[in-house]
């Protein structure tokens, strides 16, 4: 949470309990998570501020040693590494992962996809899920930072590369070891900063990739929203490809019932001596004049060179999409019922 210099901090809370056997749900205040607004309707309370002392520090180090015995290939390996979590002060935090071992991560859900579009899988590795919210800039089927790219299958063995297909088809590993990952964040009351980097180890057929990201976010006012800037850089030496992405994002609230948000981005991709520039933007506006009515409008544009998949995720580019959504709800005292929903979404290619 941002620093609060006063002795009292204001927060909003809710308490809920669900009894599955009776299909009953209790909450105070009476809110249902699937109905908007939810978070903004929490009950406000005042608590003693825990962060009055700005010199509070903590340092945690979790080392590990693991061994692997491959009976099929008759080889053995021992891995040594660890993770460091350093709360420098109430605003700053440094996280470091050295030669991480993610063997405890649960597997992904099985999703059957017969389309030509990539399926997005959220990252479940602890280091890449904790304290990562500052770097999140997203859109419709789009994320500028997708940490699943880090430690993924080596470039030389990917489906898009044919130089080692004969050798790689017998390659038993679908991941790349990570040498180090570092994340630094500083979250003040007005300004927030973040730096992120991860360096991969070399594999049998490929050199490791290098990932870098920088983030700045500024609170315009307690009610007026935020503006921010994100930059990412990826070096993929095995396929002679470099990616440089710039993103400017905004979230503005003209009033308590309206919101205007989105981003503008430029992608610079250099591959084998050729450079391509791509552009994209997203603008969305929502309005809730009353509890019964909600409207949402958006436009997305991604040109044919707006490929951010080196470090991010985009389901499809070379298109423009326009959408409108209306929700009308009737809210009696004891229950709520949805009267009508009207949704229109049109997607067109940018090149005919």
Q: What does each model-identified segment do?
A:
Residues 1-48, 57-68, 74-336:
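Outer-membrane beta-barrel channel domains
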Residues 340-341:
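Acidic, proline/serine/threonine- and glycine-rich low-complexity intrinsically disordered segments
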Residues 344-350:
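Conserved small/polar residues in nucleotide/adenosyl-binding loops
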């Amino acid at each position: 949470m941002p620093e609060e210099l006063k002795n009292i901090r204001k927060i909003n809370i809710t308490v809920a309990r669900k009894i599955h056997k009776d299909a009953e749900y209790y909450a105070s205040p009476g809110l249902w998570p699937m109905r908007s607004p939810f978070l903004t309707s929490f009950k406000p309370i005042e608590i003693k501020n825990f962060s009055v002392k700005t010199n509070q520090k903590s340092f945690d180090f979790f080392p590990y040693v693991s061994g692997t015995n491959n009976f099929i290939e008759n080889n053995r390996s021992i891995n040594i590494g660890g993770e460091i979590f350093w709360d420098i002060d109430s605003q700053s935090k440094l996280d470091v992962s050295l030669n991480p071992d993610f063997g405890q991560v649960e597997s992904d859900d099985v999703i059957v996809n017969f389309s030509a579009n990539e399926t997005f899988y959220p990252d479940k590795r602890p280091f890449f899920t904790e304290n990562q919210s500052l770097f999140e800039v997203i859109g419709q089927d789009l994320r500028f930072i997708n940490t699943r790219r880090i430690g993924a299958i080596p470039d030389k063995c990917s489906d898009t590369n044919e130089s080692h297909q004969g050798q790689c088809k017998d390659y038993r590993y679908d991941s790349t070891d990570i040498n180090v990952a570092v994340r630094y964040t500083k979250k003040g009351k007005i300004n927030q900063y973040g730096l992120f980097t991860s360096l991969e180890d070399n594999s049998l057929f490929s050199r490791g990739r290098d990932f870098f990201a920088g983030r700045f976010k500024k609170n315009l006012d307690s009610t007026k929203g935020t503006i921010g800037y994100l930059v990412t850089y990826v070096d993929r030496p095995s396929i002679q490809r470099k990616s440089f992405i710039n993103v400017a994002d905004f979230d503005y609230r003209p009033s308590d019932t309206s919101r205007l948000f989105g981003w503008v981005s430029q992608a610079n991709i250099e591959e084998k001596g050729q450079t391509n520039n791509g552009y994209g933007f997203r603008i969305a506006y929502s309005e809730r004049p009353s509890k019964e009515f909600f409207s949402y409008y958006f436009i997305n544009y991604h040109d044919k060179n707006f490929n951010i998949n080196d470090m991010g995720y985009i389901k499809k580019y070379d298109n423009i999409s326009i959408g409108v959504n209306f929700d009308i709800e009737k809210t009696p005292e004891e229950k709520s019922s949805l009267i009508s929903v009207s949704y229109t979404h049109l997607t067109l290619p940018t090149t005919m």
